[in-house]
Amino acid sequence: MASVAELKEKHAAATASVNSLRERLRQRRQMLLDTDVERYSRTQGRTPVSFNPTDLVCCRTLQGHSGKVYSLDWTPEKNWIVSASQDGRLIVWNALTSQKTHAIKLHCPWVMTCAFAPNGQSVACGGLDSACSIFNLNSQADRDGNIPVSRILTGHKGYVSSCQYVPDQETRLITSSGDQTCVLWDVTTGQRISIFGGEFPSGHTADVLSLSINSSNSNMFVSGSCDATVRLWDIRIASRAVRTYHGHEGDINSVKFFPDGQRFGTGSDDGTCRLFDVRTGHQLQVYSREPDRNDNELPTVTSIAFSISGRLLFAGYSNGDCYVWDTLLAEVVLNLGNLQNSHEGRISCLGLSSDGSALCTGSWDKNLKIWAFSGHRKIV
């Protein structure tokens, strides 16, 4: 049998070996943290996405609103768009023909957000009335073409900044609000199922401006706030945030999950877009443009969207630009603001069609524009 001294010696050697492995692992992790997507991609020989001004063209201008356009959403499967405007109306458009199928006059004109239900048969909207209104598009219209509200979701103590249906669930909707919370609703009953934040210490400490539900795992969603953080939530555990993500230096106006659900992007008042890893919390990339020559300030990022592959990031800005970023190399491959028939005001919202073939942008110039990849251009 081994003596006590020999056992102690073996224990010391094993401990030293474990500590050495731990140190090597720590150093390796630190090396990975110091490597962003851009540098890694370049070391792997990735080439930039090449774009010509004719690769993405404005094929439709949707005119009909008499006020600033604040929000838009595509149907998951069909070519329909809903838009919300300062004129106090929701308009449902046929994206292929530019035809308006519904022009719904709202009881509260100060609308900030709108969303289609997964089946495309209902739309939701919210704003300064602190409520989320649901409209069934199959309802009988009155003489003026308006349809009645089918359900009003009340309970927020501040404006409703964003709303999104849970994918593949017609009866579940999540809203974000100026009361620093997000709420999961049962649309059928109008009741709150869960409240995220508020009295719980892990919640946001300022207005919540945006949210995005993970299409790969609809139990998870992220919220962006005026407290310059993003929080990850599990709808099954409302009492605490799963993780908090830092990095921005201004209000986070837009959050959007990456197509694979493992990452998400953000757009902020600090003028940057950022890409985060959901699991590790690591900031993978920063997409930052040069300041305007006139005032030396960065325009704010108002809205973002990813292409279906995730290789492109579309970002709308307060000065009317709409940049197309190469997400791997952090390079701008196109600015829609420089193209023919571009917007003449702030880009307030944007979204990609479900098949990735078209981008819709909304602006304070009262118009929406549909941008399509030209025939010879492969969708990325």
Swiss-Prot record:
Q: Which InterPro entries match?
A: G-protein_beta_WD-40_rep, Gprotein_B, Guanine_nucleotide-bd_bsu, WD40/YVTN_repeat-like_dom_sf, WD40_repeat_CS, WD40_repeat_dom_sf, WD40_rpt
Origin, by domain of life? Eukaryota
| Keywords attached to this entry | Cell membrane, Membrane, Repeat, Transducer, WD repeat
Cellular compartment(s): Cell membrane
User: WD repeat boundaries?
Assistant: 64-94, 106-136, 155-186, 203-234, 247-277, 296-326, 342-372
Q: Name one GO biological process term.
A: seed germination
Predominant localisation class: membrane
Could you tell me which cysteines form disulfide bridges?
none
Example of a GO cellular component annotation carried by this entry? cytoplasm
Q: Which Pfam families match?
A: WD40_Gbeta (PF25391)
Q: Name one GO molecular function term.
A: signaling receptor complex adaptor activity
UniProt family annotation: Belongs to the WD repeat G protein beta family.
Name the job this protein performs.
Answer: Guanine nucleotide-binding proteins (G proteins) are involved as modulators or transducers in various transmembrane signaling systems. The beta and gamma chains are required for the GTPase activity, for replacement of GDP by GTP, and for G protein-effector interaction.
Q: How does it assemble?
A: G proteins are composed of 3 units, alpha, beta and gamma. Interacts with the gamma subunits RGG1 and RGG2.
What name has this protein been given in UniProt? Answer: Guanine nucleotide-binding protein subunit beta
Species per Swiss-Prot/TrEMBL record: Oryza sativa subsp. japonica (Rice)
